[in-house]
Amino acid sequence: MAITLEEAPWLGWLLVKALMRFAFMVVNNLVAIPSYICYVIILQPLRVLDSKRFWYIEGIMYKWLLGMVASWGWYAGYTVMEWGEDIKAVSKDEAVMLVNHQATGDVCTLMMCLQDKGLVVAQMMWLMDHIFKYTNFGIVSLVHGDFFIRQGRSYRDQQLLLLKKHLENNYRSRDRKWIVLFPEGGFLRKRRETSQAFAKKNNLPFLTNVTLPRSGATKIILNALVAQQKNGSPAGGDAKELDSKSKGLQWIIDTTIAYPKAEPIDIQTWILGYRKPTVTHVHYRIFPIKDVPLETDDLTTWLYQRFVEKEDLLSHFYETGAFPPSKGHKEAVSREMTLSNLWIFLIQSFAFLSGYMWYNIIQYFYHCLF
């Protein structure tokens, strides 16, 4: 496509802005991530003496790092509008977020919209594709205790066993509360045809805006984390206090991400900011764990039903530009999620000052030794 004289200045500015944003992102990572690693190393004695306090401090730094990623999109004009139930009400309980997956920007969107939900981000465990392990943020996720899952039928059984072991070793010992899971097992554009063929073959719902979810990881999580009452039934969100310290998993948060015109944001756009300001819409529904079946077939059916409902939610959004009202309400109410510019300035200042401090400390010891 030929570029007109009128478009040339705008495209030139877009290129310059993208290069400036990329340069800042690189510098931001070079000061923030090594500083995080240095703090974690220096705090290892505390991990031995007071593990809970160590993981609390680590979680706060982890939240700040995710806040920096969120700020890259925020200052590019990529904002979030929230719909449905208010998940702040369950921010102190254990929960699993089931999220539809369209692009890499989904992760960035969640990093942004969960920043104002108390300590949720600090105490969160992500389940993400193993490819993220090799990104700039991979080392941080490894330290924090996120789980990288390898996709593919040949890996499936092994990965589920590894997930079970990972939860047993890291979830409660690190005082985690929420788990973020993308049950579709991949991006919409990559899985849609396969999912539709599977649905047609097995007489299952034919979906366009989402794909049929996989139940394996969800089942492992529920079996590992749902506290059992003495009668054997799962302890739901409204159950009485259990004898054990933890009430176990209490909620499933069905999370639906929608982009205007069904055009998702990828992580390159989030970093470079070459797309016009965009409002991403996130819809929440909360289900008590006592209403979620644990048997494999029943759980699979339950998950399918949730994604059929996601399909309807997204169809309504793409037609009207808004999500439908919840049951019992005449109008759907949206809430604009905002980030504090002062808070962003403070965490960025801390990152750069920490980077400067650690650089000087390492340089000092290097000169002493060599």
UniProtKB/Swiss-Prot annotation:
Gene Ontology, cellular component aspect: cytoplasm; endomembrane system; endoplasmic reticulum; endoplasmic reticulum membrane; membrane
A Pfam family of this chain: Acyltransferase
Residues spanned by motif HXXXXD motif: 101-106
Purpose: Lysophospholipid acyltransferase involved in fatty acyl chain remodeling of glycerophospholipids in the endoplasmic reticulum membrane. Selectively catalyzes the transfer and esterification of saturated long-chain fatty acids from acyl-CoA to the sn-1 position of 1-lyso-2-acyl phosphatidylethanolamines (1-lyso-PE, LPE), with a preference for stearoyl CoA over palmitoyl CoA as acyl donor. Acts in concert with an unknown phospholipase A1 to convert palmitate phosphatidylethanolamine (PE) species into stearate ones.
Translocase listed as a keyword: no
Its EC number(s): 2.3.1.62, 2.3.1.22, 2.3.1.-
Annotated TM spans: 22-42, 342-362
PANTHER family (UniProt xref): 1-ACYLGLYCEROL-3-PHOSPHATE ACYLTRANSFERASE-RELATED, ACYL-COA:LYSOPHOSPHATIDYLGLYCEROL ACYLTRANSFERASE 1
Lineage, highest ranks first: Eukaryota, Metazoa, Chordata, Craniata, Vertebrata
Expression across tissues: Highly expressed in liver and placenta. Also expressed in peripheral blood, lung, kidney and brain. Detected at lower levels in colon. High expression is detected in brain and testis.
Protein's cellular compartments: Endoplasmic reticulum membrane
Protein's UniProt name: Acyl-CoA:lysophosphatidylglycerol acyltransferase 1
Keywords: Acyltransferase, Endoplasmic reticulum, Lipid biosynthesis, Lipid metabolism, Membrane, Phospholipid biosynthesis, Phospholipid metabolism, Transferase, Transmembrane, Transmembrane helix
UniProt source species: Homo sapiens
GO BP terms in the entry: phosphatidylethanolamine acyl-chain remodeling; phosphatidylglycerol acyl-chain remodeling; phosphatidylinositol acyl-chain remodeling; phospholipid biosynthetic process; positive regulation of fatty acid biosynthetic process; triglyceride biosynthetic process
Record family assignment: Belongs to the 1-acyl-sn-glycerol-3-phosphate acyltransferase family.
Annotated InterPro entries: Acyltransf_C (IPR032098), Plipid/glycerol_acylTrfase (IPR002123)
Domain notes: The HXXXXD motif is essential for acyltransferase activity and may constitute the binding site for the phosphate moiety of the glycerol-3-phosphate.
